[in-house]
């Protein structure tokens, strides 16, 4: 039985899971949920995932949500390249730290700044813009450490962070103050180009950015 992924194509967390699945050759049964119309609140989905969020993975009865957990699970269960999520606990801890930085800081500040406009048509908050710039500055400093975000090789942290930063880029946030971030992002794009980057991530990022721009004009 093929693992089932409940998702929405433009969602950044969903895109990261789709990119990894493509990279490691995992076939997923895709079930789209339109969260803008409340499809995630249907009783059968709430029964599956009480938090009723996407992405949600159902792999033979093992139900997981939170995209970064799903990334780690898919590599552990199906991946052949140990480098994507190292087994060495010290190396893995760095990958985990970057994933948590993405979840709790960088991506969260993207959501805080842009999503009130996307969802409610609210005006942009300059304080939240400054907080996003601050998080990008921290990431810029982190990139001094390794050739990639968490190691001297590509990991699942790069996938998660690439989706976040490419979405920031699609929103036309000024990335010029962050040369390491820009160079790293281009490396990620090159690495993922043969794994559906354009159709999965670039298209989704532009869809979400287009929705943002349309709300901004209202």
UniProtKB/Swiss-Prot annotation:
* PROSITE patterns reported for this sequence: GST_CTER, GST_NTER
Gene behind this protein: GstD7
Q: Which residues bind glutathione?
A: 11, 52-54, 66-68
User: Can you provide one Gene Ontology molecular function annotated for this UniProt record?
Assistant: glutathione transferase activity
What is its EC class? transferase
Q: What is its EC number?
A: 2.5.1.18
Function description? Conjugation of reduced glutathione to a wide number of exogenous and endogenous hydrophobic electrophiles.
Q: Which InterPro entries match?
A: Glutathione-S-Trfase_C-like, Glutathione-S-Trfase_C_sf, Glutathione_S-Trfase, Glutathione_S-Trfase_N, Thioredoxin-like_sf
**What name appears for this protein in its UniProt entry?**
Glutathione S-transferase D7
Source species of the chain: Anopheles gambiae
Annotated coiled-coil segments of the chain:
none
Reactions catalysed according to its record: RX + glutathione = an S-substituted glutathione + a halide anion + H(+)
Describe the family membership recorded for this protein in Swiss-Prot or TrEMBL: Belongs to the GST superfamily. Theta family.
Q: Name one GO cellular component term.
A: extracellular region
Q: How does it assemble?
A: Homodimer.
**Pfam families this protein is in?**
GST_C_2, GST_N
